[in-house]
């Protein structure tokens, strides 16, 4: 059963609807019947819920109202498909991921921002930027994270700068000609605590779904970080089974250099997590030959790991590759 076809965003058989004033009977004895302001549907399923307040009211009142609805079990049954909650006044707008009553936290309700990082408070500007098609569809699918971290399971929605960074990289990857050779796509500069892991995972996952990409390799600069990164990525993997994410999902760790070699050659659009050290050891093997595949390399802490002769040798060894760097400490030409 296909509910949302990612190849038909804003096109094909996908149907978008805006429904106002949906009446919902009380789900808990003693509670009131409720009327939802505005609901956005994709193929008949509620995906984005909007609550509106007049300009004399605070936007947090709309958030509080949705918190109350969650506590009253109103976002159950068919409304369990809700992904994003939006609180609107004429002069302020915030959005957040749908959640449970006990995990509802307004600190995770964000303002939208434009590409210059200016906060968007006007409701019409927000609607044009985030609630239009195809953006609303993309936000509710491509830019959501189902975090399966043990004891911290939660649905998360990406912040504007994370969305823009991911969009820019994917857009540039679409232009890559792997037959041309090693392609340096660009760097993403993420400061500490700004959600680099989420952004890099989404970039890796979306890249792995591109028709001209065979493999995605996420490269850490120390062997010790391989396990931590693999666990983070596996927790975000929508194809993973919580009972056995290491085996069921698309994110694959590499235990040895031989394991890395085997996974690079394997079929399937896996996301491989490995280290610079394993790649360096692999290409120095006497009979090493790069697989005949289009490979996207995403390099973590690129300000440290991309310097030196060993990394240049790695780039030279993979002829059909595209390279993306993530860094929290970029080194410009005048950096000492």
Model-derived features: positions:
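ATP-dependent helicase/translocase motor core
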Residues: 1-215, 224, 228-240, 267-268, ...
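Conserved motor-coupling elements within RecA-like helicase/translocase cores
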Residues: 256-272, 288-289
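Conserved helicase/translocase P-loop NTPase motor core
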Residues: 269-285
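Signature of the SF2 helicase/ATPase Hel1-core->accessory helical subdomain module
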Residues: 59-62, 97, 280-286, 290-336
């Amino acid at each position: 059963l296909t509910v949302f076809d990612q190849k038909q965003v804003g096109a094909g058989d996908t149907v978008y609807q805006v429904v106002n004033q949906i009446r919902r009977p009380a789900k808990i004895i003693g509670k009131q019947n409720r009327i939802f302001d505005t609901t956005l549907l994709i193929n008949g399923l509620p995906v984005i819920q909007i609550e509106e307040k007049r300009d004399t009211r605070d936007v947090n009142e709309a958030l509080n109202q949705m918190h109350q609805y969650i506590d009253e079990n109103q976002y159950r049954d068919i409304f369990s498909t809700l992904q994003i909650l939006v609180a609107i006044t004429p002069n302020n707008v915030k959005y957040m991921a749908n959640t449970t009553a006990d995990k509802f936290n307004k600190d995770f309700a964000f303002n939208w921002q434009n590409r210059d990082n200016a906060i968007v408070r006007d409701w019409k500007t927000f609607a044009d930027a985030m609630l239009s098609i195809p953006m609303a569809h993309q936000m509710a699918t491509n830019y959501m994270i189902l975090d399966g971290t043990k004891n911290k399971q939660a649905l998360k929605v990406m912040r504007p700068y994370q969305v823009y960074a991911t969009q820019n990289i994917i857009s540039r990857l679409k232009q890559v000609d792997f037959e041309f050779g090693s392609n340096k796509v660009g760097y993403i500069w993420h400061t500490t605590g700004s959600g680099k892991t989420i952004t890099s995972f989404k970039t890796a996952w979306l890249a792995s779904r591109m028709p001209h990409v065979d493999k995605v390799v996420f490269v850490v600069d120390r062997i010790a970080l391989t396990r931590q990164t693999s666990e983070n990525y596996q927790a975000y993997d929508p194809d993973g089974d919580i009972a056995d994410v290491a085996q069921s999902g698309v994110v694959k760790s590499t235990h040895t250099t031989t394991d890395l070699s085997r996974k690079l050659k394997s079929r399937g659009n896996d996301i491989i997590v490995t280290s610079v050290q394993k790649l360096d050891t692999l290409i120095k093997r006497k009979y090493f030959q790069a697989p005949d595949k289009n490979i996207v390399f995403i390099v973590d802490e690129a300000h440290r790991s991309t310097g030196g002769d060993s990394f240049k040798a790695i780039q030279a060894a993979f002829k059909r590759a595209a390279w993306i760097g993530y860094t929290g400490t970029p080194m410009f030409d005048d950096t000492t």
